[in-house]
């Protein structure tokens, strides 16, 4: 019997494939089962084109048999089988695809597809076996042949006996090594788990004889083992069922079975698309944040199937980061696969699916916001932060997609509102969308800077997330209304008369303010009369793009560079404290220095900033109490 050489590449290529392409050895079973499914598909196709043939589904199945004692694993099918020439052409050439050739030779009709890439996928058998035998009898032939190979050195083909058409793959499982436990691929539980994981939705039954126990007939207290045939796979995935046949409970059960979360989904999306690219998808929006969601360990992505065969557990390319909380599956027959499903080529079809999914999620969230506000607010409590990161990231390129999904707490409504709702009720004379930043709504309400805006009757949005102001700086405006912090130097709300009065106050007290600025030794950019304060004596305002709150966030990051916002100390000249300042300036410069330091540190504390010298601050308080 002649040993033939592989026609494609030498041992180096086969070694490269085994060691590099396949990252998980268990996928060998997925590949071989997929090839068996292809073989049955070909029989089905023949029945579509030959009226003399009848496809009786019960006669077509895949069987997996484990023989632990002899270290043999068999995968058999009742598919179309292979002739001697097909064995040589399909198995003698690495990466030769019999399924692909079959597609080329036959017009593929609607509803019919072949998932396999025969060749490299088949050779994944060598991941777990160093002796692979294929026994096959082609449909309509009286002859059967046995193909055998022990690795890259070559293969043999010889006639053999086989009663029925179909193919049987016999793997001699490798012995264990220090690095690998090959015994597991002979265990019923492991084989069943691999089938459920990768091949649960193959449309033909995958059968195994499973070990069961039952009480002995002569002694009910003792048990004996017996074998019982079971179909392991579900065959019909939920996403291929008619949506009208499914209930919310069915989706919730699927969510739980897939271990997407311990909660119930707040929203599920079942979509089927036919067009340039065709796919089925079920997407879930969770109710609560996964415990690791905001950690580097969290991995976004959807399960990706090709015709019911799992390709990737988490395909991150299907979701933008800002929708990374979405769970679910996508199944398509249009994906381009590079080298037997293990490496997915990020091609045009995948990008089209990702684009469609992004739009679908956005539309569903907008619908949830409009029709089920309570549910949306619950979702936003968990994942609003992620949407705001989406606005900020990638230089704001996604802001138009996400801006209508944002919500903030409102000073007027005392609840969460959208930007559209805020703008819709702005008075005609209001130029800006005003916001205030703080650690909590309660602290923001007590900010001195907010008094002037509220006194004008304007609504203020409360920013309590550290990402909020960064996102809004990237957004810049909404419906042609710019955003303005209540701590900004110019609020844009004063009338001409008040503007002139304020400028007059600065001129009148110029020397006092310059003296206070000098006493603060560069800690503030300026000291001036406040246009915004009503009841408080002092506050800090900021000049420029970097706000005081942004300074706090940036300096809290690892390896901070001690970034400082340009601060302005604003004095309420209508407050009694200002009279004390004027008296000290005119008669006691040392007391003026004491008052200036106290007011500056008071303003820092109101902003939640650390004071430079707490001991000096408390000593100064004691001085004025004497």
From Swiss-Prot:
It comes from the Bacteria. Residues 342-552 are annotated as: B. One of its GO terms (cellular component) is cytosol. Its main location: cytoplasm. Residues 498-509 have a biased composition (Basic and acidic residues). Keywords: ATP-binding, Chaperone, Cytoplasm, Nucleotide-binding, Stress response. Residues 490-509 are annotated as: Disordered. Residues 1-341 are annotated as: A. Homodimer. Molecular chaperone. Has ATPase activity. Belongs to the heat shock protein 90 family. This is Chaperone protein HtpG.
């Amino acid at each position: 019997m002649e040993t033939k050489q592989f026609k494609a590449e030498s041992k180096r290529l086969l070694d490269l494939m085994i060691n590099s392409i396949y990252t998980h050895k268990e996928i060998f079973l997925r590949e071989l089962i997929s090839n068996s499914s292809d073989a049955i598909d070909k029989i089905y196709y023949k029945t579509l084109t030959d009226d003399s043939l009848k496809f009786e589904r019960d006669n077509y199945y895949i069987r997996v048999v484990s023989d632990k004692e002899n270290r043999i694993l068999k995968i058999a099918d009742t598919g179309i089988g292979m002739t001697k020439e097909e064995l040589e052409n399909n198995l003698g050439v690495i990466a030769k695809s019999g399924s692909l050739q079959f597609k080329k030779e036959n017009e593929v009709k609607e509803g019919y597809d072949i998932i396999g890439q025969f060749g490299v996928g088949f050779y994944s058998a060598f991941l777990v076996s160093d002796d692979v035998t294929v026994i096959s009898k082609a449909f309509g032939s009286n002859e059967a042949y046995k193909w055998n190979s022990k690795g890259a050195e070559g293969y043999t083909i010889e006639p053999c006996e086989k009663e029925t058409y179909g193919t049987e793959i016999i793997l001699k499982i490798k012995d264990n090594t220090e690095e690998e436990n090959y015994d597991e691929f002979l265990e019923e539980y492991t084989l069943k788990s691999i089938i459920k994981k990768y091949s649960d939705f193959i449309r033909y039954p995958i059968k195994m004889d499973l070990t069961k126990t039952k009480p002995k007939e002569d002694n009910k207290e003792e048990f004996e083992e017996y074998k019982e045939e079971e179909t392991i796979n579900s065959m019909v995935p939920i996403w291929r069922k008619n949506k009208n046949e499914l209930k919310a409970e069915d989706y919730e059960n699927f969510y739980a079975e897939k271990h997407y979360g311990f909660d119930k989904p707040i929203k599920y999306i079942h979509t089927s698309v036919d067009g340039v690219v065709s796919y089925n998808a079920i997407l879930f929006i969770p109710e609560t944040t996964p415990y690791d969601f905001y950690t580097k360990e969290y991995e976004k992505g959807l399960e990706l199937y090709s015709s019911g065969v799992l390709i990737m557990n988490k395909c991150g390319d299907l979701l933008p980061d800002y929708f990374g909380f979405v769970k679910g599956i996508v199944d398509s027959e249009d994906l381009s696969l590079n080298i037997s499903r293990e490496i997915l080529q990020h091609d045009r079809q995948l990008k089209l699916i990702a684009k469609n999914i992004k739009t679908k999620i956005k539309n569903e969230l907008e619908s949830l916001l409009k029709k089920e506000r309570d549910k949306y607010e619950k979702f936003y409590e968990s994942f609003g932060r992620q949407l705001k990161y989406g606005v900020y990231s990638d230089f704001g390129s996604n802001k138009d997609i996400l801006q209508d999904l944002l919500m903030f707490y409102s000073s007027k409504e005392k609840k969460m509102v959208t930007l559209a709702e805020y703008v819709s009720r702005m008075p005609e004379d209001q130029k800006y969308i005003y916001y205030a930043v703080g650690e909590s709504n309660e602290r923001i309400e007590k900010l001195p800077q907010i008094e002037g805006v509220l006194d004008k009757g304007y609504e203020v949005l409360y920013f309590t997330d550290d990402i909020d102001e960064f996102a809004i700086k990237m957004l810049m405006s909404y419906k042609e209304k710019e955003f303005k912090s209540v701590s900004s130097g110019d609020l844009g709300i004063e009338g001409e008369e008040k503007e002139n009065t304020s400028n007059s106050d600065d001129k009148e007290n110029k020397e006092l303010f310059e003296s206070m600025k000098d006493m603060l030794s560069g800690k503030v950019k300026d000291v001036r009369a406040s246009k915004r304060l009503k009841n408080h004596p002092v506050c800090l305002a900021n000049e420029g793009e970097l706000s005081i709150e942004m300074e706090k966030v940036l300096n809290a990051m690892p390896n901070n560079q001690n970034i400082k916002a340009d601060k302005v100390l604003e004095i309420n000249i209508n407050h009694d404290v200002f009279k004390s300042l004027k008296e000290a300036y005119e008669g006691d410069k040392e007391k003026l220095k004491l008052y200036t330091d106290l007011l500056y540190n008071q303003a820092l504390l109101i902003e939640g900033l650390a004071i430079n010298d707490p001991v000096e601050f408390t000593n100064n308080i004691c001085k004025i109490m004497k």
